[in-house]
Structures are given as C-alpha cells and as structure tokens.
Regions:
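Hydrophobic pocket/interface hotspot
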Residues: 27, 37, 63-65, 81, ...
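Hydrophobic/aromatic beta-strand elements that line small-molecule binding cavities or substrate pockets
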Residues: 18, 52-55, 77-83, 94, ...
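Intrinsic-disorder/low-complexity, polar/charged segments enriched in Ser/Thr/Lys/Arg/Asp/Glu/Gln
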Residues: 11-17, 24, 50, 62, ...
C-alpha cells in the first residue's frame, strides 16, 4: 500500500505527496479529463456526489465542480488554470472563497512507470489556511488510493 503524506510546511502552505502506480502521462490525464477526474477525485467515504465536472485544462481555462452534499443547494468549487505543462505540472486558483483564495499546484515526476505526485495548497494568509482546516487534506489519502485504482484500470 502506498503512503500519502500531508504536511503543513509553513503558515500558508500544505503539501500532500504520494507515489502512484502509473506513468505521468496517465496521471496528467486523470487530473485534466473530466470523465477520468470524476472517477477518483471525491473520497467515497465522504458520501458526496459529484453532480458536474467541467475542466478546461489550459492556461486561462476554467474549472468548476459541483457537489451534492445533502443540503438544499449544491456546493461548488471553481477557478482558473494558471499553469498547464503536459505530463509534469498543473496549477489553478481556488476562487470559491472570494478574493485571495488559495492556489493549488500539482507536480508529477515519473520514475520507472510510477509517478510522484506533489500537491501544494498555498493560501493567502495563515488565517485562511487555519480556516480551511485539515479535513480536505486528510481526505487526500483516500483520494489518492482511488487514483491508484483508476490507473490500474486504465493499464
């Protein structure tokens, strides 16, 4: 079993790492193609359903994820891609919190058919990171396990 690490590296940043069983090309596709992304991104144990997933993975392109969380209105996450380097790097803004949201940066480093995935969440302030809590970061272990399952199915 692969180990996912979650580390608060500064007052403004959390870093999640895991080596997954698949080439960087497939991992990049899993992050950028909606039909693949929706198969692994939401931890099953959270009981949330992804209602819609739009990913326009190019610099300046937009993404939007809408979840059914059992309430009256869906919960949405959205932002803009600021860096898209095929098979090695992605970065996007997280704009659902208003001005000054966090930025997510994903780097991929392939070695021997396996890929080290590093996800950096950088917040505008310590208070913003504190407010975000650790729930989403803690769910990343399950999320990455689901990514590994998907990569196995894709071969």
């Amino acid at each position: 079993m692969q180990r996912t690490t979650v580390e608060r590296t500064s007052d403004r940043e959390v870093v999640v790492t895991r080596t997954v069983n698949g080439p960087a090309r497939l991992v990049f596709q899993a992050f950028t193609q909606a039909d693949l992304f929706q198969r692994w991104w939401v931890p099953k144990s959270m009981g949330m359903k992804l209602l819609s997933c739009t990913l326009d993975a190019r610099v300046g392109g937009l993404y939007r994820l809408e979840f059914d969380v059992g309430g009256s209105a869906p919960m949405a996450f959205f932002g803009t891609y600021v860096d898209v380097t095929p098979h090695s790097r992605l970065a996007w803004t997280n704009d659902e919190g208003g001005d000054g949201g966090s930025v997510t940066t994903v780097t991929l480093e392939e070695t021997g058919g396996r890929t080290l995935v590093v996800v950096r969440e950088t917040y505008p302030s310590k208070a913003a990171l504190d407010a975000a809590g650790t729930g989403a970061q803690d769910a990343m272990a399950e999320t990455f396990a689901q990514l590994d399952e998907l990569l196995g199915a894709l071969g």
